[in-house]
């Protein structure tokens, strides 16, 4: 519930905004937005989730409204405030303008940090591997793990400059802080990635730009990110951001969120490709039947082909818009659900009959 102290902090922040923001104009819609956000986050509405969707026209002062209300509440609940924008332009505006203003008028002290994806930071180990001891030797060029082709002189100069800048602490390690960023193909060779990262086991861990940035974010009250980073981080198990239970999320320009969520949380497959692949396996299936003297595999393959055709026919009758069909909120039709369950069982049965036994 909203305590008297919290209400006073929100009012004080709002009063501060009136004096600190130039050309401030009091709007009733902005006042209502502050009130509704505050009541929702503090569970003033019983039996509802603390989620609110706010739609307001340009010029309402939405950013100021959610900062005035959310900053004191996040501090009170001991949670991180994660502000996710839809694009880089808005992210920079929030970072360089809105948050800076909020530091002046907010009734609570807070620290903020910008969160970026791991690939925006250099991996020191990779950078050193590509620049160490190759000034008079061509051995490194032959190492396919480091180079798929001989690097150009310009590539090497870029790498040496980055290594020197990082060593002298004149470069933060973020690609966005470079005056002349390298080509993407070169950057990918030295960028951080979760597949090769040794984390605390790496000898350069204490000097790692990515982990230093993550440490700064973990010590901050407000984290400025973007939709893609938040969604990707949820999928990857909170490698960059704190656990979702420890955060209050603000999705600015949330009308972009549904499309971004679809791209992150969906996977695809072609029924026609599956049917073609199954037909191409026919020769191998015939060999298996000869060896095992069992027609069970062929029977399962035929059932898979039939189920895929039935699924394809059903899907082709749906009314797609721009190659997308969104099912109603009540769920996927039983016909599709039953067919996919049937295919799952059939595929597993095929694997059972075609996989070698432990005794083979």
What do these predicted regions represent?
Residues 2-18, 25, 47, 77-221, ...:
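A substrate-engagement module of RecA-like helicase motors
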Residues 25-41:
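N-terminal pre-P-loop "Q-motif" helix
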Residues 205-219, 227-348:
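Signature of the SF2 helicase/ATPase Hel1-core->accessory helical subdomain module
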Residues 353-360:
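Conserved small/polar residues in nucleotide/adenosyl-binding loops
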Residues 47-66:
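Walker A/P-loop
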Residues 51, 80, 222, 248-249:
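Hydrophobic "anchor" residues on beta-strands that sit immediately upstream
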Residues 64-77, 100:
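Walker A/P-loop NTP-binding motif
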